[in-house]
From Swiss-Prot:
The gene is epc2. Residues 372-398, 484-507, 602-623, 642-669 are annotated as: Disordered. The keyword Zinc does not apply. This is Enhancer of polycomb homolog 2. May play a role in transcription or DNA repair. Keywords: Chromatin regulator, DNA damage, DNA repair, Nucleus, Transcription, Transcription regulation. Residues 602-611 have a biased composition (Low complexity).
């Protein structure tokens, strides 16, 4: 213990430790003066903690006054003991519980607020409890939400109402108190927070920072004295040297490029001197860069949607290195956009295309990055604009045409331009496709002028209107004026003549007056379109159809086409399935009216027979001399005449040895195909006759309907595989059942016999109409099979009518 100062060394197990007895140990006062070699700080604290101002004041006071003063000490909170308060909080009775940790898995603990009330808050709470009940925990939760929602800027009252789900008065009171207390508070928040280190380094010397970030310190050897500052200086020096080396390399590259440019300039001058290019013409021609063209093979687009990948083949032209070495900016001319011709100029006839050469693009107008397609040699086109100035001056704006790389564009052919339906003469199907007709709409009932019907997407019917000089006049036309001839004009095909073209149509449309236009529509020289009405099966519409049936049919009838001859029966004309269904509905309705009228007549005849039996016999004898009325004959003839395609069907009998025609009765002979018919009552007066629409089946390609007249007779008509002819003589009318007929269809004009039938029917208006009593049998027989007759129009009886 001779040395008063020593340095602590590690214990050596090989070295024996000295043993001291109690009398050899020095006293405590003697050991106080021993100082170790490792110096200790007077406070025993770290270097950062010594800078605390309370500690420095205490140390400086001790050094000045050489004694310890009570006022100059480090502030330490005093520990006080209040036994009475402690005994009130903690009772003396204590029982050890069975378990110290209680877990309630199904109950979630409510989050406790970080804010704690103070005496000032308690005063406000007592004042608020006078008007409403509010708990301390509820008040702490409100203040806590306001504090956490605010950072440097306080929340507004509207935002506070969204945060707090309380009464508006309570929210406003708490909010005003919180704002006032927050402004008076010196700290950043009312909730006490642990002080942490700031990133700007301002809290490095603050001893009250609780948590600091770990600083990465360099491990240096103490014997060489390499600290962190010297290491950072070396890194900075290395970066500066690297930057200087990079700058020198770039300067070296720049000077080398200048030298190469000087050599190339000398070579160009020598070549120009040898070529004699003193004006620079050859040099300017070489400076124009040649554009490389690429040919892209576009994969074919299949109809089934499967696009097979086709390898692209890019064919590049030979590259000239002398062209690409010097790329100079060339002033590019502005792209010219020719004005589009107006609609009036399209109507004028286009002159014949001449064999003038196409304009060639100047190569100087093309920039370096303007790529032309593979067709530029044959059909050169102007490249697309690239500058924003040109795009602004472009009349099309953002919708201007621009070339797309890899696409092939073909120039328009001058010989096919302006080939529109309005400028060319069309004939046949093309003329019907592009023609415009005078059109009438059903709902609302009005005329819209000239229009063209076409089929749009989804099956919609679209009307394309055509503007003419007479639009104001045509729209004032009464649609009822066109109803008489609209059906025939829009169904019948106009006569196709080579002299009638669209030019003549335009002449009629633009120069004719209103009466001339109407006369042209009536004579089918000008087309008129009117939509067809749908035929419904409602009872109300059936009554309207039955009332207007005669008037419509009389208007449509032009001639009756039925001929009888000695050697055969010739039937001219036919009707369509749609017209047949329309006539069938009208006939069924008229048949019902006839049946009701017949029943009324029978009741009146029975009453007259009981009162005047002799008068009934004379009336019955006069009944046989009277025949068919005019309305029934005209309606029967209209079933044949009113058809879209006029035609004639001739039915010729086989002229064999045993055939004879006695008073219009055709004798059956051999076997042949049967004529199918449909029985339907037809008359405006009760009980006159029954009209049949006969379907002739003599050839696979022929299918015609023949209107016939069947008078009811007490005798029955028996039918079998071959139709037997049954004849009923009524003065000048005979009913014939044709058998063994061969049908040939050909187009012809109405026969004289048909015109004779119309004349006879018109003269019969003066004959009084008498209802035979035997007509009920045919009507009753017709009512047994209404469904089968409505579907296919086939019946078991086949009769024809002959007027003598």
């Amino acid at each position: 213990m001779s040395k008063l100062s020593f340095r602590a060394r590690a214990l050596d197990a090989a070295k024996p430790l000295p043993i001291y007895r109690g009398k050899d140990m020095p006293d405590l006062n003697d050991c106080v003066s021993i100082n170790r070699a490792v110096p200790q700080m007077p406070t025993g604290m770290e270097k950062e903690e010594e800078s605390e101002h309370h500690l420095q004041r205490a140390i400086s006071a001790q050094q000045v006054f050489r004694e310890k003063k009570e006022s100059m000490v480090i502030p330490v909170p005093e520990a006080e003991s209040n036994v009475h308060y402690y005994s009130r909080l903690y009772k003396g009775e204590f029982k050890q519980p069975k378990q110290f940790i209680h877990i309630q898995p199904f109950n979630l603990d409510y989050e406790q607020p970080d804010y704690d009330m103070d005496s000032e808050d308690e005063t406000l709470l007592n004042r608020l409890n006078r008007k409403m009940e509010i708990k301390p925990l509820q008040f702490e939760i409100m203040i806590d939400r306001l504090e956490k929602a605010s950072s440097n800027q306080l929340v507004t009252l509207q935002e506070a109402k969204l945060l707090l789900n309380e009464d508006d008065y309570l929210i406003k009171s708490v909010y005003d108190y919180w704002v006032r207390k927050r402004k008076n508070c010196r700290g950043p928040s009312l909730i006490p927070q642990v002080k942490q280190e700031k990133r700007d380094g301002s809290t490095n010397n603050d001893p009250y920072v609780a948590f600091r970030r770990r600083t990465e310190k360099m491990q240096t050897r103490k014997n060489r004295k390499n600290d962190e500052v010297s290491y950072e200086k070396m890194l900075k020096l290395r970066r500066e040297f690297s930057r200087a080396i990079t700058i020198l390399e770039m300067i070296k590259r720049r000077e080398k490029t200048k030298r190469e440019l000087l050599h190339l300039t000398l070579e160009v001058v020598e070549k120009r001197y040898n070529l004699g290019d003193f004006g620079g013409e050859i040099l300017n021609e070489i400076k124009i860069p040649k554009v490389e063209k690429e040919i892209h093979v576009i994969p074919p687009s299949l109809h089934n949607g499967n696009h097979h990948k086709v390898p692209e083949c890019k064919v590049k032209n030979t590259h000239h290195p002398s062209v690409k070495d010097e790329v100079l900016e060339i002033v590019r001319l502005k792209k010219k956009y020719p004005k589009k011709p107006k609609a009036e100029t399209l109507v004028t006839p286009q002159p014949q295309a001449t064999s003038e050469p196409l304009a060639v693009i100047n190569k100087s107008d093309i920039k370096q990055y303007d790529f032309q397609s593979s067709d530029d040699d044959e059909f050169p086109q102007v490249p697309s604009p690239l500058s924003e100035l040109e795009e602004e001056n472009d009349p099309d704006g953002s919708y201007a045409f621009r070339r797309r790389t890899g696409c092939q564009y073909y120039a328009p052919r001058l010989d096919q331009m302006n080939d529109t339906p309005e400028t060319t003469d069309l004939s046949g199907l093309a003329r019907h496709r592009y023609r415009h007709c005078l059109t009438t709409l059903t709902v609302p009932r009005r005329c819209i002028g000239f229009a063209r019907k076409r089929l749009g997407r989804g099956g919609r019917v679209i009307m394309d209107r055509l503007s003419t000089e007479h639009d104001s006049i045509l729209k004032q036309i009464d649609p009822e004026m066109l109803s008489g001839f609209s059906s025939s004009s829009h169904v019948a095909q106009p006569p196709s003549s080579p002299s009638r073209t669209n030019a003549s149509d335009r002449h009629c449309e633009n120069r004719l007056s209103l009466p001339e236009i109407l006369s042209n529509i009536k004579s089918c020289r000008l087309q008129c379109f009117q939509p067809r009405l749908l035929h419904t099966q409602d009872s109300d519409r059936e009554e309207c159809t039955s009332r207007l049936g005669q008037a419509v049919n009389v208007k449509r009838v032009s001639a009756a086409l039925l001929n009888t001859s000695k050697n055969g029966i010739t039937v001219t004309g036919g009707i369509t399935e749609e017209q047949f269904q329309t006539h069938q509905q009208q006939l069924v309705q008229m048949q019902r009216q006839q049946l009701a009228q017949l029943q009324q007549k029978q009741q009146s005849q029975q009453s007259l027979q009981q009162s005047h039996p002799k008068a009934q016999g004379s009336a019955k004898s006069d009944c046989m001399s009277k025949t068919l009325d005019s309305a029934s004959a005209l309606f029967a003839a209209s079933a044949v005449v009113n058809s879209p395609t006029p035609g004639r069907s001739e039915v010729n009998k086989d002229q064999n040895a045993g055939h004879s025609n006695l008073n219009g009765v055709v004798q059956p002979s051999g076997t042949a195909k049967t004529l199918y018919s449909t029985n339907m009552a037809l008359s405006s007066s009760p009980g006159i006759s029954t009209v049949q629409l006969v379907r002739t089946v003599g050839h696979p390609t022929t299918n015609h309907l023949i209107p016939t007249l069947c008078t009811s007779n007490p005798q029955t008509l028996t039918m079998g595989n071959s139709c037997l002819a049954n004849t009923v003589h009524l003065n000048n009318v005979s009913v014939v059942s044709p058998v063994n007929v061969h049908i040939n269809t050909r187009t012809s004009a109405p026969s004289p016999t048909a015109l004779k039938l119309a004349t006879v029917a018109a003269s019969m208006d003066r004959v009084p109409k008498v209802t035979p009593s035997s007509a009920i049998s045919s009507i009753a027989r017709e009512n047994h099979e209404p469904e089968r007759l409505g579907l296919n129009g086939i019946a078991d009886t086949t009769v024809a009518m002959e007027v003598t």
